[in-house]
Structures are given as structure tokens and as C-alpha cells.
Swiss-Prot record:
UniProt GO MF annotations: antifreeze activity; ice binding
UniProt key word Signal: yes
Propeptide intervals in chain numbering: 24-44
Gene Ontology BP term (one): response to freezing
Function: Contributes to protect fish blood from freezing at subzero sea water temperatures. Lowers the blood freezing point. Binds to nascent ice crystals and prevents further growth.
Species of the source: Pseudopleuronectes americanus
One Gene Ontology CC term in the entry: extracellular space
Identification of the protein by name: Ice-structuring protein B
Induction: By winter conditions, at least in part by water temperatures of below 8 degrees Celsius.
Length: 82
């Protein structure tokens, strides 16, 4: 009996909080449609950001390849020494 009263209490609390949330919607939810209407001037920024990200990715890949080659050379030298 106590468990069922507890469950009923939880349901009442759930519906009460839902009612409060519907009465006072989140301001961020109102701002979302405004943020969706991004001006066309933001497109070049996106393109330059993408180019910068691609350059950074290429630099990271080159550094990783150099590190791998250096590690392989060091391992080969250590193996040759015995």
C-alpha cells in the first residue's frame, strides 16, 4: 500500500511539473527559430573555418606520420642492436 501511494505521489508530482513547464516555456526554445535564420554573410565564415580545420587536420596527420616513422626507425635500430 505504501509503495502504491508513493507511486501515485510521483505521478502527481510529474504532472504538476509538466503543467508548470507548459505555463512557462524555456526562453532558449523561443530563441531556436531565430538562430535557425542565420544570415547569408555567415557562409564565408563557415567556409574559412572549414578550410582552417582541413589545414589543421592535414598538419596533424603529417605530424602523426612523422612520429610513426620516427618510432619505426627507433624500433628497427633497437632491434638491430639486439
Amino acid at each position: 500500500m505504501a509503495l502504491s501511494l508513493f507511486t501515485v505521489g510521483q505521478l502527481i508530482f510529474l504532472f504538476w511539473t509538466m503543467r508548470i513547464t507548459e505555463a512557462r516555456p524555456d526562453p532558449a526554445a523561443k530563441a531556436a527559430p531565430a538562430a535557425a535564420a542565420v544570415p547569408a554573410a555567415a557562409a564565408p565564415d563557415t567556409a574559412s573555418d572549414a578550410a582552417a580545420a582541413a589545414a589543421l587536420t592535414a598538419a596533424n596527420a603529417a605530424a602523426a606520420a612523422k612520429l610513426t616513422a620516427d618510432n619505426a626507425a627507433a624500433a628497427a635500430a633497437a632491434t638491430a642492436r639486439g
